[in-house]
Design a protein with these regions (language model features):
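Extracellular interaction modules
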Residues: 67-70, 207-212, 264-275, 302
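Proteolytic cleavage junctions
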Residues: 18-19, 228-233, 240-299
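Self-processing/autoproteolytic domain segments and adjacent N-terminal interaction modules in large
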Residues: 19-62, 67-73, 77, 81, ...
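Short loop/turn motifs at secondary-structure boundaries
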Residues: 283-378
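Residue-level detector of buried hydrophobic side-chain packing
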Residues: 214, 236-237, 276, 323, ...
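Exposed aromatic-hydrophobic patches
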Residues: 215-217, 258-269, 335-341
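Bacterial Sec-dependent N-terminal signal peptides
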Residues: 1-25, 276-278
Length: 378
């Protein structure tokens, strides 16, 4: 018969005047066995060969799991009114039940998380009972992260694109311009040209392999109706680490209403993006045309820019002062450097002389057309 060694002592490190159970040996919960923790757990020994239920229960105080070794539970129940705090990774291999209270991880240390292994699952998550901080998943099925912040459950949904790799996520109910634990702000005025607006109410941190896609969720407090006129205009956006700006990550599917719904991103590489949130694309009325450019190959202002035009199927024509077409293209992508490609010009396929030119821009979906002038200067 295996002997279990427990040391019971008073500890003020976690919660004043509460007792803590220190495991310095080897604890194992056998199949159909149950153990209830009404005090803090400090795991400095072996506690990873479990087949039964580990429950954490307290109707008055908070509880914590700490120690030098990671505990691994088969089934875990949390029924702690003032929350269960993790100071060490805690692993689940079958199921977790969020009966009462949050499981709180230190947001300033994303390496500590509640870890769902081997396609494990959870139940009973709510606005007031979820993982407040980081959760991870190791499996090959779709996973709906039970993450939240400030009494607000806001799942992120994804399928692991690389089986047996670890994906991790956390939700932040805060303005990305003023993040609480990140080193740098995420300026919502620093935008890719086709993006017009970014949510300042919330964001997610998501870590996963290349070729990932995510589904973000919202409710009425997300104020999606203040971002876009309709849900088809809504986008998933991400803060690009290298370019230091918000980029469009797409809208492959959207469901629900302004009050509650989901949006799917396109496939992207999470390693390139620090955080994710909701955004809106430039509308036709928000297209911004820069009339002056200097295509002298100095790396600054070398092309004719129509900010946001990449979002629209279009036709662009450029005319000289005699009304001759000197450049024409379908689906302009802000890459014209003043080189002629059409009409009767002296130096076809060469750059046009400095001077004033005129354009017509047609947006094909709406049929809207606009005209104006531009000036080339070398």
């Amino acid at each position: 018969m295996r002997r279990l060694t427990f040391i019971l002592f008073f500890s003020s490190s976690f919660c004043l005047a509460q007792q803590a159970l220190l495991n310095a040996g080897n604890i194992q919960i056998h199949q159909d066995g149950e153990i209830g923790f009404h005090v803090n757990l400090i795991n400095n020994g072996t506690f990873n060969q479990n087949l039964g239920l580990a429950g954490f229960y307290n109707t008055t105080n908070s509880l914590s799991i700490a120690g030098s070794q990671i505990p691994r539970f088969y089934d875990m129940e949390v029924d702690v009114v003032n929350h269960l705090f993790l100071d060490v990774n805690t692993e689940i291999i079958n199921s977790a039940a969020y009966t009462t209270g949050d499981v709180i991880t230190p947001r300033s240390n994303p390496s500590i998380s509640l870890d769902y292994l081997d396609n494990s699952f959870y139940v009973l998550e709510t606005d007031i009972s979820n993982t407040d901080g980081y959760a991870s998943f190791n499996g090959n099925t779709e996973f709906r992260f039970p993450i939240g912040d400030d009494d607000k459950l806001r799942p992120l949904i994804t399928t692991n694109s690389t089986p047996n790799s670890i994906i991790k996520a956390a939700y932040f109910n805060e303005d990305p311009n003023f993040p609480s634990v990140f080193t740098n702000p995420f300026d919502t005025n620093s935008l890719e040209s086709i993006v017009s607006q970014i949510s300042i109410l919330e964001f997610w941190d998501f870590d996963g392999p290349d070729n990932s896609f995510v589904t973000l969720t919202w409710d009425s407090e997300s104020e999606i109706d203040q971002l876009v006129p309709d849900l088809l205009s809504l986008r998933v956006v991400g803060w690009h680490i290298s370019d230091q700006e918000w980029k469009d990550l797409g809208n492959s599917n959207v469901t629900g209403t302004f009050a509650e719904g989901t949006i799917n991103s396109f496939v992207f590489n999470p390693l390139d993006y620090e955080i994710l949130t909701f955004g809106a694309l430039v509308t036709e009325d928000e297209l911004e045309i820069f009339n002056l450019f200097s295509p002298n190959d100095d790396g600054a202002n070398d092309t004719f820019i129509i900010k946001g035009i990449e979002s629209f199927e279009n036709n662009l024509k450029i005319y000289n002062r005699w009304g001759n077409i000197v450049f024409e293209v379908n689906n302009y992508q802000n890459d014209w450097d003043g080189t002629s490609n059409a009409g009767r010009v002296i130096r076809r396929n060469q750059k046009l002389p400095a001077g004033t030119y005129f354009y017509t821009l047609e947006l094909k979906e709406s049929g809207r057309a606009s005209t104006g002038w531009l000036y080339i200067n070398y």
